[in-house]
Curated annotation (Swiss-Prot):
Changing R453C: In a gastric cancer. It comes from Homo sapiens. This is Receptor-type tyrosine-protein phosphatase T. Residues 809-828 have a biased composition (Polar residues). Residues 291-384, 389-483, 484-590, 591-726 form the Fibronectin type-III domain. The gene is PTPRT.
Length: 1441
């Protein structure tokens, strides 16, 4: 019964479970339906753990009681009672299918409780390799019957594979897992995607390997795709691209491959219908190649290396498709590679002297195929020449004995070698010998050269060198700073002693160490032959300029030894002193003054006189002598007035035999005459061997008293006439011849006296009539006399036994000088009250002495028709010549040679024509300046210039044309060759629109050929400019100083109105030109007219000074013999005369600042005899030379329409000085009563005007605005009676015509009210506004000619100076006004100019300044009190320092 039941159940189940679809279909080898034993299909099972294994079940043959077991014939595992994870394997036979095919099977999961019985995994093992991970699996709940699954397998011959079914149990989950109907189909699966052939992937080590899995089938988002490694490691895949609806692809990468990455990989996909498995593809990892040996070095250069790569022996895989060289510096981090395509390779563009590391890189195919660099070749390139020498080399510190250089720091980029040297080479010339030296520099960018010589021109350069070469910097030429100089050579000090003077000269120090600027000489008396001499004050100090290596010390005490300590100075200070001693000669005793020559008592045979002791001078009085001289008829009164001392003793007894007119009546010892006492001449006594016989009653006598001093072999004598005694009157009728002679002498004396009185009276009257001033004329007369007396002074010093020289007078070639009486037989120095006539002023660095030249014979031949003119007759002569009655300037000028008078063949040569500005003003052959010939140019010796003789100075001048562009270099060659220290320029660069001269001087430094010219200083003055240069020639260490005197006030046409400015210019040139310098170079445009005027004036001033005469005609004639047409027009010829006349009338009135205080008291002291002073004489001369104003000179002010604009018609502004108004004010004219005035420094610096009238206030403010006036100085009080009312706004603003004046501020400082206004032209607002200060000086009462306080007026001047410095840059003008624009305004302008002169030139010349002001306005400084006041303010100004 039981068996029947089972059978029935089995049948029932068969009926319930439908058969497997296609269960009995035919399949390829490897399939199995399990109807027979599975081994018949080639299947096998592997016994699992604890007997867990696959069993073949055939329920048809053996039914199963458990309903969970399906019916049929199949393979199954029973997981009941199994531990979790137990596995059972069913192995299919090995298959060798080629290409893609399908394996499908059915599986069945069942359990009683419907829980999962476990898992079913399917493995595809290829070529007997590892099992790996399952390609398909299922787990979970039981299935609802048999479920079909597909395996799409892609394999390719000769590979084979084996499918393994694995059952995995789950603990506590009993059930059954069955597999049935396994088929191997020769076509792709219906549902499961299949893969195309997976290709092998070859990569290089370290690269990412990418596998691309291409599947056929339909992609579903639920499909799972992965890459399965041979050893079973899975990597998920992502579909990257769907090709079409039946094909898709996915990629996966194996990152950072290495040899351990070498393996086989296949693609696996799991879909709802099953799994697809690709073939295994191999991942091949190649090792990039590396050379075994380093490259071989073949050759080395500075910027290249030749190498051989040595790439045949390698480590790694080939093939080698690329060879590269990698190189880098051993100290750097960068590397560079070059492709090598030849057996040897040259590395270019390397850096010199750098160590390189060179390796070879080999590359095989594929990304990352370049292997690591091979072993390195380490080598160093050679050094290369430096790129350039040191750059931007400059001197940053210059000292006397050292220089500090600085240059642009450089490194390897410049040196191109790590081993280099930096050297400084320098050379200089010392004592005409060239020295060269070099020093190695250790610092990087600066170096100090030490041990140099001061003030030395040094040429230096830096040298940068390395083993391969060297480069130099640009040459620098620098001069070390000055140092204190060495000592003046003691042996060079020479002294010429006189009585009260010592002339001392010396040579500069051997080591000047710079430009000697000053010499300081300290002197003091150290002993005297005269024990009574007070030497306490005999000391002092003088300073001499660099070009004055001599000095005449005056005011010394005779017979005294002086020590002189000399030291030189540069800009750095004084050097060591050197001391010498020189003694003055003894002087004749100083004789006392006798009020009258009337004797105390007189008889027929005696005369009693008073004897006074003499004052010793340098040596004690040795003896007194009383001399009696007989006066005879043949001696004129003039000759008798000349006192002659008696050096040869003659006794009364010897006088007759020697026919001597004099005899010694007595000789007294100094002890015998201690005090004043009477002495009777003719007392018939003997004194020290000399008989004093009675006098003859019939003779006339002169009684002389003389004193002698003897010391050191010298004998000096001085004498005085004590009395005269006439012959006695006889009562007999017979007249003795001696009486007659004596009476004749007396009568002649009386007549001569009367004649002299009449002549003097007529001279005074003539002087007044001609308005000449004796003081002015006497300047040149006295200078001439001084020269003669100085020349003859040496003859008058007596030796021990020399006879007394008689005074001599050297006569001029054209007239006789008057004789001068002298009370001393030895005249070594001329002393006069005039300050311009001191023997030689003691100089400091600020003084301005004017040198004189030694008088010699006249250098110009005197024509008998044009004789030289005495200075005293010059005014009369010029007046007569200007009248032109019969013979005047016109005829005299026409008598001069005109045009060419000598050959000028050289100037006419074709090669020299372009060197001449004008074809008719060229150089004579005989006097032309010949330049040194330049190499290769025989015509380079020509320049249009001629030597011109001066007064006793051959070739003292060079007259030349103004340089042209082609001749500038030649001009400077001439300056250097001739050693000229002064250039006089009497033209402007452009006149009337025409170029008269090219600018041939630099603003800073310029090189003309081989001459380097550097501007040092510019001193602008009102009428001329002084520029100071240093001049240096290439190859010479000498640096010379040169001054260019540029006279800027010569008008474009004609001549200057007055010679005042030109005379000051001439004196300045004369003073500043060193005596040892070469010719003064003078030029205008052509080098004829103005040039000749300057030379003629300078020459004639020298003649007037030395001889008291002038010879202008013959001077010009001689000038024209040396250069054509010097003094070119009659107008210039007359101007030369006028200039000389003004110089003679006015004299030289300049006073050095250092002497002003002492001289001022002398010139202001009243002479009791004349009741005058030199200042008064100056002012009288000033009135004489002040130009008379003619009506035609002030024609504009005289126009009727301008009458009401003038306070007075007496003094009107000159037409040429008028400031015409520019701003338009209705119908008002452009006239204002004002004049432009020069200051000392600035032309037209002042605008002098009257106090504005009510109808001219607008004109006044137009003047202020139009002429850029920054200051207004008001010097008068407001007075309504005089129509002097306020013309400015107070606290507000006001309009005056077109000018708006706005009050800004005001303050009061003692006597000064200081206001500030802002003004603008309302008609031209675009011009902006200007700031103007208004200085109202209230300290000058109306009733006084001068203000009571000099200090307060100086405060106005200082306020004006300060304002100009701070606000207008000294460019604005100053309006100065008083009531009439005359005396007060002129006084203020003169004071301002004097202050400027003191500051700029250290001299005071009040006369010159006032004369300059009066040339433009005749009422400037109206009274003597105002003129004196200017002097007094100058003294006050000096006291403020």
């Amino acid at each position: 019964m039981a068996s029947l039941a089972a059978l029935a159940l089995s049948l029932l189940l068969r009926l319930q479970l439908p058969p497997l679809p296609g269960a009995r279909a035919q399949s390829a080898a490897g399939g199995c339906s399990f109807d027979e034993h599975y081994s018949n299909c080639g299947y096998s099972v592997a016994l699992g753990t604890n007997g867990f294994t696959w069993e073949q079940i055939n329920t048809w043959e053996k039914p199963m009681l458990d309903q969970a077991v399906p019916t049929g014939s199949f393979m199954m595992v029973n997981s009941s009672g199994r531990a979790s994870g137990q596995k059972a394997h069913l192995l299919l036979p090995t298959l060798k299918e080629n290409d893609t095919h399908c394996i499908d099977f059915h599986y069945y999961f069942s359990s009683r409780d419907r829980s999962s019985p476990g898992a079913l995994n399917v493995y595809v093992k290829v070529n007997g390799g590892p099992q790996g991970n399952p390609v398909w699996n299922v787990s979970g709940v039981v299935t609802e019957g048999w479920v079909k699954a597909e395996l799409a397998i892609s394999t390719f011959w000769p590979h084979f594979y084996q499918v393994i079914f694995e059952s995995v149990s789950l603990k506590g989950h009993p059930g059954y897992i069955a597999v049935d109907e396994v088929r191997v189909l020769a076509h792709p699966c219906r549902k499961a995607p299949h893969f195309l052939r997976l290709q092998n992937v070859e990569v290089n080590v370290g690269q990412n390997a990418t596998f691309q899995c291409i599947a056929g089938g339909k992609w579903s988002q639920h499909d799972k795709l992965w890459l399965q490694q041979w050893n079973g490691r899975d990597t998920a895949l992502m579909v990257t691209r769907v090709v079409n609806h039946r094909r898709f692809s996915a990629t996966v990468s194996v990152a950072d491959t290495a040899q351990r990455s070498v393996s086989k990989y296949r693609c696996v996909i799991r879909s709802d219908g099953g799994s697809g498995v690709s073939n295994y593809a191999e991942l091949i990892v190649k090792e990039p190649p590396t050379p075994i040996a380093p490259p071989e070095l073949l050759a080395v250069g500075a910027t290249y290396l030749w190498i051989k790569p040595n790439a045949n022996s390698i480590i790694g895989d080939g093939p080698i498709i690329l060879k590269e060289v990698e190189y880098r510096t051993t100290t750097g981090t960068w590397a560079e590679t070059h492709i090598v395509d030849s057996p040897n390779y040259k590395l270019w563009h390397l850096d010199p002297d750098v160590e390189y590391e060179i390796r070879v890189l080999l590359t095989r195919p594929g990304e990352g195929g370049t292997g690591p660099p091979g072993p390195p070749l380490t080598t160093r390139t050679k050094c290369a020449d430096p790129v350039h020498g040191p750059q931007n080399v400059e001197i940053v510190d210059i000292r006397a004995r050292q220089l500090t250089l600085q240059w642009e720091p450089f490194g390897y980029a410049v040196t191109r070698c790590h081993s280099y040297n930096l050297t400084v080479q320098y050379q200089y010339v010392f004592n005409q010998q060239q020295y060269e030296a070099e020093e190695v520099i250790q610092t990087s960018s600066h170096y100090t050269l030490r041990g140099l010589r001061p003030f030395m021109t040094i040429r230096l350069r830096l040298l940068l060198s390395n083993p391969e070469g060297r480069m130099e910097s640009e040459e620098l030429v620098v001069q070390t700073e000055e140092d204190v100089p060495g000592a003046v050579p003691l042996e060079s000090i020479q002294g010429g002693p006189f009585e009260e003077k010592i002339y001392i000269q010396w040579k500069p120090p051997n080591e000047t160490n710079g430009v000697i600027t000053l010499y300081e000489i300290n002197y003091k008396a150290v002993g005297s032959l005269d024990p009574s001499a007070d030497l306490s004050s005999q000391r002092g100090k003088v300073f001499k300029l660099r070009n004055e290596t001599h000095h005449l010390f005056v005011g010394l005490y005779p017979g005294t030894t002086y020590s002189f300590t000399i030291k030189a100075s540069t800009a750095k200070g004084f050097g060591p002193p050197v001391t010498t001693r020189i003694a003055t000669k003894i002087s004749a005793p100083s004789m006392p003054e006798y009020d009258t020559d009337t004797p105390l008592n007189e008889t027929d045979t005696t005369i009693t006189v008073m004897l006074k002791p003499a004052q010793s001078r340098g040596a004690p009085v040795s003896v007194y002598q009383l001399v009696v001289k007989e006066e005879r008829l043949q001696k004129s009164r003039r000759a008798a007035d000349i006192i002659e001392c008696f050096s040869v003793p003659v006794s009364y007894r010897n006088a007759s035999s020697l026919d001597s007119l004099h005899y010694f009546a007595a000789e007294l010892k100094p002890a015998n005459l201690p005090v004043t006492q009477p002495f009777t001449v003719g007392d018939n006594k003997t004194y020290n061997g000399y008989w004093n016989p009675p006098l003859s009653p019939l003779k006339s006598y002169s009684i002389y008293f003389q004193a002698l001093s003897k010391a050191n072999g010298e004998t000096k004598i001085n004498c005085v006439r004590l009395a005269t005694k006439g012959a006695s009157t006889q009562n007999s009728n017979t007249v003795e011849p001696e009486k007659q002679v004596d009476n004749t002498v007396k009568m002649a004396g009386v007549i001569a006296g009367l004649l002299m009185f009449i002549i003097i009276l007529l001279g005074v009257m003539l002087t007044i009539k001609r308005r000449r001033n004796a003081y002015s004329y006497s300047y040149y007369l006295k200078l001439a006399k001084k020269q003669k007396e100085t020349q003859s002074g040496a003859q008058r010093e007596m030796g021990p036994v020399a006879s007394a020289d008689k005074p001599t007078t050297k006569l001029s070639a054209s007239r006789n000088d008057e004789g001068f009486s002298s009370s001393s037989q030895d005249v070594n120095g001329f002393t006069d009250g005039s300050r311009g006539e001191l023997s030689q002023p003691t100089l400091t660095i600020q003084t301005h002495p004017y040198r004189t030249c030694d008088p010699v014979e006249m250098s110009y031949p005197r024509d008998q028709f044009q004789p030289a003119i005495r200075v005293a007759d010059l005014l009369q002569h010029i007046t007569q010549m200007k009248r032109g009655q019969g013979y005047g300037f016109k005829e005299e000028y026409e008598a001069l040679p005109e045009g060419q008078t000598a050959s000028w063949d050289t100037a006419k040569e074709d090669e020299n024509r372009n060197k001449n500005r004008y074809g008719n003003i060229i150089s004579y052959d005989h006097s032309r300046v010949r330049l040194l010939v330049l190499d290769g140019d025989p015509h380079s010796d020509y320049i249009n210039a001629n030597y011109i003789d001066g007064y006793h100075r051959p070739r003292h001048y060079i007259a030349t044309q103004g340089p042209m562009q082609e001749t500038v270099k030649d001009f400077w060659r001439m300056i250097w060759q001739e050693n000229s220290a002064s250039i006089v320029m009497v033209t402007n660069l452009v006149e009337v629109g025409r170029v008269k001269c090219v600018r041939y001087w630099p603003d800073d430094t310029e090189v003309y050929g081989d001459i380097k010219v550097t501007l040092i200083e510019t001193e602008p003055l009102a009428e001329y400019v002084i520029r100071t240069f240093t001049v240096q020639k290439k190859g010479y260490h000498e640096i010379r100083e040169l001054r260019l005197f540029h006279f800027t006030s010569w008008p474009d046409h004609g001549v200057p109105c007055y010679a005042t400015g030109l005379l000051g210019f001439v004196r300045q040139v004369k003073f500043l030109n060193p005596p040892e310098a070469g010719p003064i170079v003078v030029h205008c445009s052509a080098g004829a007219g103005r040039t000749g005027c300057f030379i003629a004036i300078d020459t004639m001033l020298d003649m007037a000074e030395n001889e008291g005469v002038v010879d202008i005609f013959n001077c010009v004639r001689e000038l024209r013999a040396q250069r054509v047409n010097l003094v070119q027009t009659e107008e210039q010829y007359v101007f030369v005369h006028d200039a000389i006349l003004e110089a003679c009338l006015c004299g030289n009135t300049a006073i050095p600042v250092c002497e002003f205080r002492s001289l001022y008291y002398n010139i202001s002291r009243l002479d009791p005899q004349t009741n005058s002073s030199q200042i008064k004489d100056e002012f009288q001369t000033l009135n004489i030379v002040t130009p008379r104003v003619r009506p035609e000179d002030c024609s504009i002010g005289l126009l009727p329409r301008n009458h009401d604009k003038n306070r007075s018609m007496d003094v009107l502004p000159l037409d040429r000085c008028l400031p015409f108004l520019i701003s338009v004010d209705g119908e008002s004219s452009n006239y204002i009563n004002a004049a432009l005035m020069d200051s000392h420094k600035q032309p037209a610096a002042f605008v002098v005007t009257q106090h504005p009238l009510p109808n001219t206030v607008a004109d006044f403010w137009r003047l202020v605005f139009d002429y850029n006036c920054s200051s207004v100085v008001m010097l008068n009080e407001m007075d309504t009676a005089q129509f002097c009312m306020q013309y400015w706004p107070e606290k507000t603003s006001g309009c005056y015509g077109p000018i708006q004046v706005e009050f800004v501020s005001a303050d009061i400082d003692e006597d000064i009210i200081h206001r500030i206004f802002r003004i603008c032209n309302m008609a031209r607002p675009q011009d902006g506004y200007r700031i103007v200060q208004h200085l109202q000086y209230i300290g000058w009462p109306a009733y006084r000619d001068t203000p009571p306080s000099k200090r307060s007026l100086l405060k106005v001047v200082r306020r004006l100076e300060k304002w100009q410095e701070q606000y207008d840059g000294r460019e604005g003008r100053t309006v100065v006004h008083c009531l009439n624009g005359g005396g007060r305004s002129g006084t203020f302008c003169a004071i301002c100019s004097v202050c400027e002169m003191i500051q700029q030139q250290n001299i005071i010349d009040v006369f010159h300044i006032v004369k300059t002001l009066r040339n433009n306005k005749s009422n400037m400084v109206e009274t003597l009190e105002q003129y004196k006041f200017v002097y007094e303010v100058a003294l006050e100004y000096l006291s403020s320092f």
